[in-house]
A protein has these predicted regions:
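N-terminal targeting or regulatory segments adjacent to alpha/beta-hydrolase or S9 domains
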Residues: 1-71
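Alpha/beta-hydrolase superfamily serine-hydrolase fold, recognizing
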Residues: 11-32, 52, 80-82, 89-276
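Short linear interaction segments
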Residues: 66, 84-86
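A domain-start/cap signature at the N-terminus of enzymes
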Residues: 70-82
Length: 276
């Protein structure tokens, strides 16, 4: 009986300590939350991602690198997939095509094309996860969205993903009419790691004489030299530790001490003249 009572008391004290620690942690996060726009505040922002060691998230992500799943869409688009190769690099892509006439195009005739490279820190994600966003983009712009798959850095580091996505872009530039696209109106866009990929693709296409019409960057990973920031910047979700770990996984642990190949870290390009 005495042992049982001691165990119960210990469990109760442990619970109280855990609750007190949780409250203290939540209170410590409030100053950072106040810097976030009210409409963007969420319980998710309390997750202690800022406490992760640099490589923890990057290493753990190898278990999720190949996961891709479609999500419900609310726009009238047709979704297909195809595989091809260009200049010796094989790739596969998801294609979203709007149905009928839209604000951006007639029901028939070539449509503009957006090559969308998805985000995920070069670690996770897939084009199907972006179906809702890409379907909306296709429907509202009257554009065909081509979203290539690519290897994650835990599978193959740079330049594997760059080469796959560049092959997809060049294929679209040369064969986009087979999808109903207007090859004179091609844009490249992406978010997070996909934004960095998009920037590198556009730079390379320009350098090799195949410029595109537009570039869209959504909170892109552009610069491997990113450092810690003050205040609330870098305190939520994609924090400094995972960011450093992701760049190391993508470019190597010595990426801050060596000269990187072109397009690996697009922000290092000094001359942006002529780019969209």
């Amino acid at each position: 009986m005495r042992v049982s009572r001691v165990l119960k008391t210990g469990a109760a004290l442990t619970g109280v300590a855990a609750a007190a620690g949780t409250v203290a942690y939540a209170l410590s996060r409030r100053p950072y939350l106040r810097e976030v726009a009210p409409g963007l505040r969420s319980p998710v922002l309390y997750l202690p991602m800022h406490l992760l060691a640099d490589a923890t998230f990057a290493r753990a992500s190898r278990f999720f690198a190949s996961i891709d799943f479609s999500r419900p869409i609310r726009h009238a688009v047709d979704i297909t997939e195809f595989s091809a190769s260009f200049d010796g690099h094989a790739f596969s892509a998801r294609v979203l095509t709007p149905r009928g006439a839209t604000a951006g195009a007639a029901a028939s005739g070539p449509r503009p094309v957006v090559v969308w490279t998805h985000g995920g820190g070069h670690l996770i994600g897939g084009p199907a996860m972006y179906d809702p966003q890409n379907a909306r983009m296709a429907a509202e712009l009257g554009a065909i969205v081509v979203a290539p798959r690519y290897h994650k850095s835990t599978q193959e580091p740079f330049p594997a993903d760059h080469d796959e996505c560049y092959a997809a872009l060049r294929w679209v530039q040369e064969n986009g009419d087979k999808l109903g696209g207007d090859t004179s109106r091609i844009a490249v866009a992406g978010d997070s790691a996909g934004g960095g990929l998009a920037a590198g693709l556009v730079q390379r296409a320009f350098d090799e004489g195949h410029p595109v019409r537009a570039l869209g960057l959504v909170y892109p990973m552009l610069d491997h030299r990113t450092t810690d920031k003050s205040g609330a910047v870098g305190q939520f979700i994609w924090t400094a530790g995972p960011n450093r770990g992701a760049w190391s996984m993508y470019l190597g642990d010595d990426h801050l001490d060596v000269d990187l190949p072109p397009y690996a870290s697009p922000a290092t390009r000094s001359d942006l003249s002529g780019l969209p």
